[in-house]
Amino acid sequence: FGHPHRRFATIHVAGTNGKGSCSHTLAAILQASGLKVGLFTSPHLVDFRERIRVNGKMVSEKYVIDFVEEHRSFFEPLHPSFFELTTAMAFKYFAEQEVDVAVVEVGLGGRLDCTNIISPELAIITNISFDHTQFLGDTLAKIATEKAGVIKPETPVIIGEYTEETRPVFESKAMQENAPITFAQDDKEILTATPNTGQGFDYETKDFGRLHGELGGYYQERNANTVLCACRQLISMGIIKDHDCIKKGFANVTETTGLRGRWERIQTSPTVIC
């Protein structure tokens, strides 16, 4: 495919929980700043095409069908996994759509994940807990080692949350790669979080004023803090130009990026939450 992943900037998002919320919020912010944004996430909730979006719009059914049919003879001898095939499709689609930047969510782990072929502008590791232990290891330190594989030479990395077991792993890998590292847990951007009239929270922040957060769930405060630390880095890199796009992005994640199933109210009588 001619290395399509080299034709656009990327932000790589790893971690056990919060990847989807952080990825969609970052995409909403980048779109609000006027960029053409690719978004690659998994798994999908209803439709496979949710995984691959440009400015919130899902890849077309025709593109998916044509991609598989056109390249079937190439793929069949290789026996790629479902996720490897999907990743190749996403990167090719983003390149053809000429996106400015793509937010790329890791599928599993990090070090050996096929998305780790990218050389991102920024890496984010949301948190570490026990998941996929048969593949990633049976201790938090082992799991952190796999996820720390997304830390690249001289590439800034944001760590959302850490434990006494995982922090040394991240510090060691960042030092090895000469990568600037920020621990969002210690560098609080969120000062207060107050439930708002919607499903989400209004945040008083250290550097970005008052933000109306759309996403619900008590855990979104931690996700928001991670995203804001990432935004501060992206501002310093000139990728995000101002604070206004951050306000717009936080307030319009679902409409802008199509995010579903994050403490989403889908019925009121009776109340049904997805």
Regions found by a protein language model. Give the residues of each.
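ATP-dependent carboxylate-amine ligase catalytic core
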Residues: 3-6, 32-118, 134-136, 165
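Short glycine/serine/threonine/alanine-rich loop segments
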Residues: 35, 155, 177-181
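Extended acidic/charged loop-beta regions that coordinate divalent cations
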Residues: 43, 86-135, 167-210, 259
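Walker A (P-loop) phosphate-binding motif
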Residues: 1-45, 122-124
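Short loop-to-beta-strand entry elements in the cores of soluble alpha/beta enzymes
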Residues: 152-161
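Nucleotide phosphate-binding/pyrophosphate-handling subdomain across enzymes
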Residues: 7, 96, 101-106, 114-124, ...
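Membrane-proximal helix-turn-helix segments that form the acceptor-binding/catalytic region
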Residues: 144-153
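Beta-strand->loop->alpha-helix junctions that form or flank phosphate-binding loops
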Residues: 160-161, 173-195, 214-218, 247-255, ...
